[in-house]
């Protein structure tokens, strides 16, 4: 990609922002090297990894990227047999912890990630090693300190050192507190010189305390002496220190050996961590600028929806709509200076570079970007003082370089093409350059204020006009890009608004040719028509959004209706269960009374009374069945069609639960037109009810029957083999109801032998059932332990 183009379009500023969002030197290094790619497949993958990282952050929050160090040099040293120092080992442990934290971050999500999620794949390739990580942290406290418990030997040596040091301090304190030596001591303190314990002695008494002189004060008044009484002890400490250092070297060697065993894994981890840091930096850039992933193509088609230049103030930037590549591949943008033409060029160019670098772009969903092999830009004043080139010459030199390399896979951006020289010749050159690029098949966007180029765009195939809108009333540009409309100079209108005399303006108009006047009138007509089209488009979009909103509301109301219907059904089932329980209780009372009567005397009168009770029980059960078999009124059955419907009546559309107003009387088929919000709907009167007719009509026809269909003849056994325990108990419970009401005194429950779960669960249920008098396992010939025989009361 052309380096000059990257600079002109300020791609480097986007890279600077990206670098600042990376947390590690590894991620920053990758960000600094980022350049646009020209291969569609690679760009698609780069865009996808950015999208995947955005999805990760949206679901899981900010990833833990701390502790990612560049330990590649340390790993090289490990490979050649060197021993790592404590600082290097700590950084290695940090990397292992970073790996573990990222894997935990990725796994703490109940939402399954797409199988082809690039970020998930990378994190899955990381290899943690908590054992080595913990051992390093346990052994090393800082870059300068090894922990006592790094090894038992080190702990023992340091204990000996501390004991020896305390012994020396005690001896030296005895000397400085002794009345014999007090007048020789400069200060009653024990201090260190090198690694030897000494005491400060006055210069004039240095011979009074036998020992080794190690240092003196700056003034020479104090001599630091190691008394002979502690020389041997200091020597012992020195020996222990040597042993301590040797043990530390041994520990560092062992830890380095652990690292050597996983060096390949660590090298892979470092590479992946750097890549992840870079990818998450791209995701944060996308979120910071409210970006989207563009739809990619290699057909030179660009469609930008509400694109916002990322380097402009978010509060003031005006979004642009831009397209090229469908009906035209050359766009001529005209309009006043500072009207936004250059910003449009830079937005298109920078969006292309960002897209091909795998970065999201600040635009709306549905934005499409093409992959170009080459991107060229001639924007701004590139005059070279050193080469003594004029503005025109400087631009022309740049343009010549572009024209030499351009081809059909090139995007070319020109700002004020042909400016800086005679207008007639400049316009002619500009048209010739555009024609050359058009014949080459390049995608070209050029800004200009030459009227000749407007006419060229109108009359040339695959070339289109555009302008940056200018508000004559406020004398300010709106920065809106209008494609299909040539720009107007607005010189007369602006001059008039600024107070220029009318007679001067009218005289100026006389100098215009008739063709100029017709052309300006045509531009005014085109702009007016486009504005009307834009207004209609905005109005249509408003209607569309309102319709979508209404659709969502209707769907939500439909969902609530379904929920209410389900709730009513559940309530009805609960009521049915309540009725059944009451019936069971009453039946138990009747049967109990019947059995008492049968057991008293067997005369005809008693038998007659027993028969009456049996008939009463049967009528009760039949009554319950009839009650439970009454249908629930379906949602459409609750409506009684209104009579005498007329326009203006307020109605409720039942299946939509939406209020509306009748517009037409019923036709021959019983349909009326109803205004519901912004929609007019044909509805049958059976699906309507007047708003003031809120009565719910419940009849005995419809659907949704909830019934308790008891068999006319009840079997003496039930088979629940293959059921789970809950299903089995529910089936047994219902079966015992029927058997009990039918007057059976003994039934068999076939549960099978198996694991015994069904047998024990069912028998536990039977123990607490008031309908059961007793139960037992089957005997030989009855099914043995695979069957439970139940005696009913």
Curated annotation (Swiss-Prot):
InterPro entries: DNA_mismatch_repair_MutS_C, DNA_mismatch_repair_MutS_core, DNA_mismatch_repair_MutS_sf, MSSS, MutS, MutS2, P-loop_NTPase, Smr_dom. It is an enzyme of class 3 (hydrolase). The keyword Iron does not apply. It comes from the Bacteria. Keywords: ATP-binding, DNA-binding, Endonuclease, Hydrolase, Nuclease, Nucleotide-binding, RNA-binding, rRNA-binding. One of its GO terms (molecular function) is endonuclease activity. Residues 718-793 form the Smr domain. ATP binds at residues 335-342. One of its GO terms (biological process) is negative regulation of DNA recombination. Its EC number is 3.1.-.-, 3.6.4.-. It holds the Pfam family MutS_V. The keyword tRNA-binding does not apply. Homodimer. Binds to stalled ribosomes, contacting rRNA. Endonuclease that is involved in the suppression of homologous recombination and thus may have a key role in the control of bacterial genetic diversity. NCBIfam families: mutS2. Belongs to the DNA mismatch repair MutS family. MutS2 subfamily. This is Endonuclease MutS2. It comes from Acetivibrio thermocellus (strain ATCC 27405 / DSM 1237 / JCM 9322 / NBRC 103400 / NCIMB 10682 / NRRL B-4536 / VPI 7372).
